[in-house]
Curated annotation (Swiss-Prot):
Domain notes: The presence of a 'disulfide through disulfide knot' structurally defines this protein as a knottin.
Protein name: U1-lycotoxin-Ls1aa
A GO cellular-component term linked to this record: extracellular region
Phylogenetic classification of the source organism: Eukaryota, Metazoa, Ecdysozoa, Arthropoda, Chelicerata
Pfam families: Toxin_35
Length: 110
């Protein structure tokens, strides 16, 4: 009887220790996921929206519906005759075509 009681106490101790370790692992994973989401949200706040100027930060455009916007540049001639480069965040034509196809696919199949 003493052996069964001792074995039961040992089993309960091991079970509680292992479950505490698992809970710590889950808590750590939750914290890591939360920090990752916060970092993504911060990056999203700092991004440049569609149709806004991205001349100084060409890789900082926000994400669109399916794809990230791309910084598209054009050369502009000022009134004084100087050529300057002006850039804006927008959707490239091949991304627009892909979004159109996906939209039709959703309407037909979805």
């Amino acid at each position: 009887m003493k052996f069964v009681l001792l074995f039961g106490v040992l089993l309960v101790t091991l079970f509680s220790y292992s479950s505490a370790e698992m809970l710590d692992d889950f808590d750590q994973a939750d914290e890591d996921e939360l920090l990752s989401l916060i970092e993504k949200e911060e990056a999203r706040k700092d991004c440049i929206p569609k149709h806004h100027e991205c001349t100084s930060n060409k890789h900082g455009c926000c994400g669109g519906h399916l794809f990230k916007y791309k910084c598209q540049c054009t050369t502009v001639v000022t009134q004084s005759g100087e050529e300057t480069e002006r850039c804006f965040c927008g959707t490239p034509p091949h991304h627009k075509a892909a979004e159109l196809v996906v939209g039709f696919g959703k309407k037909i199949f979805g």
